[in-house]
Amino acid sequence: MGKPDLSVEVAGIKLRNPVMTASGTFGYGKEFADYLDLEKIGAIITKGLSIRPKAGNPTPRIVETPGGMLNAIGLQNVGIDAFIQEKLPFLRTVNTPVIVNLYGNTLEEYGELAEKLDKLPEVAGLEVNISCPNVKQGGIVFGTDPNAAYEVVSLVRESTIKPLIVKLSPNVTNVVEMANACVDAGADALSLINTLTGMAIDLQKRRPILANMTGGLSGPAIKPVALRMVWQVAQAVKVPVIGIGGIMTATDALEFMLAGATAVQVGTANFLDPSAAQTIAEGMETYLEENGIADVKELIGALIT
């Protein structure tokens, strides 16, 4: 048997392997170029971009927790115009699909961002963040109400012909209802899960540790929740699902594929090991070789229940 085929396709975007980087954990790509080969991963997903630059939340805004971390960065970013002028030129030189994550505080901002990105051939697709739990206005509302989510996705769909991935929040009662609303509105793929809203308290000070009070929980602690939600959504929709949540190893990634994910995103692992995404992709290839599996796509949704 020759080398196994790790390629997958998500919303018309061809990936050399199923491993993408999760937004907010990989900067704009260049920051990690010294630590791994950007042409050995499936796709680069940028930090979440807004219309105007954003300073983010006051510190402290990160705290380690058992099995993960809480972050309340507050979607700090350079803004869409600076991204296009300063960050995109480097990404043009990399032969790996670039997917831009975007978020707005209003419906109109989502549409405006999509229109600006629609004209850029080097942007392979958009990932719409309707689910970030640490912003005091905007995202949380869109991400937890099916009608609001439908409105946002519909507007972005009208504003671009690019492949459209919608990132879902786990902070909902019925994730399948949210998934269906986004697909009905025109999503080409769904990525899940974003972080779970959490809190950490300092007993001595009797105060929250994070200046923002609450933050997003990520890392291995959320993996069982993520697997369950990916499995539920993958059975309910006809578009590709991208699994996110506590993926630290190739084993984790392959478990998400069995649950129904076509691709995965690596997030918190990038902070612990900046070469994690490449290491996970290589580990997946090794697993296929050792188990005589010719094509990684054989594993998608192959969970025996």
Swiss-Prot record:
Alphabetized InterPro entries for the sequence: Aldolase_TIM (IPR013785), DHO_dehydrogenase (IPR050074), DHOD_1B (IPR033888), Dihydroorotate_DH_1 (IPR024920), Dihydroorotate_DH_1_2 (IPR012135), Dihydroorotate_DH_cat (IPR005720), Dihydroorotate_DH_CS (IPR001295), Dihydroorotate_DH_I (IPR049622)
Keyword Signal recorded: no
State where substrate binds: 47, 71-75, 129, 194-195
User: In which pathway is this protein known to take part?
Assistant: Pyrimidine metabolism; UMP biosynthesis via de novo pathway; orotate from (S)-dihydroorotate (NAD(+) route): step 1/1
Q: What is its EC number?
A: 1.3.1.14
CDD domains according to UniProt: DHOD_1B_like
One GO BP annotation is: 'de novo' UMP biosynthetic process
* The keyword Nucleus is annotated on this UniProt entry: no
Q: How is the cofactor bound?
A: Binds 1 FMN per subunit.
Q: Which residues of the sequence carry a binding annotation for FMN?
A: 23, 47-48, 101, 129, 167, 193, 219, 245-246, 267-268
Q: Which cofactor does it need?
A: FMN
Record field: catalytic activity: (S)-dihydroorotate + NAD(+) = orotate + NADH + H(+)
Any one Gene Ontology MF annotation carried by this entry is: dihydroorotate dehydrogenase (NAD+) activity
Subcellular location as annotated: Cytoplasm
Q: Which Pfam families match?
A: DHO_dh
Family label: Belongs to the dihydroorotate dehydrogenase family. Type 1 subfamily.
HAMAP family found in the cross-reference section: DHO_dh_type1 (MF_00224)
Q: How does it assemble?
A: Heterotetramer of 2 PyrK and 2 PyrD type B subunits.
What is the protein name given in its UniProt record? Dihydroorotate dehydrogenase B (NAD(+)), catalytic subunit
Q: Which gene encodes it?
A: pyrD
